[in-house]
Amino acid sequence: MTPTLLREVGEAIYGPRWQSELSRALAVSDRTMRRWLAGVNDVPDAVRAELRVLAQGRRKALDRVIARLR
């Protein structure tokens, strides 16, 4: 996973202040997140699966809200 994709997913799930929230959700430090984003360390493969679960959860929540707005 590239730092760019990590940033895109983080912003899509949590909005503009995504880094700290995503760090908490993944149980990693803010420093680890910054190192992934800077390309200092690779994003572990397991994080991709965790991000998929988080994104799917956000999508379900949004779908419920959208349904209520109809």
Positions of the model-derived regions?
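A short, Lys/Arg-rich alpha-helix, primarily the initiator
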Residues: 1-15, 57, 61
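Alpha-helix boundary/capping and short turn/kink residues
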Residues: 15-16, 41
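Short alpha-helical DNA-recognition segment
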Residues: 16-34
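Alpha-helix N-cap and coil->helix boundary residues
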Residues: 17-21, 46, 64
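Short, basic-rich loop-to-helix N-cap that marks the start of a DNA-contacting helix
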Residues: 40-53
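Short, charged recognition helix plus adjacent turn
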Residues: 59-70
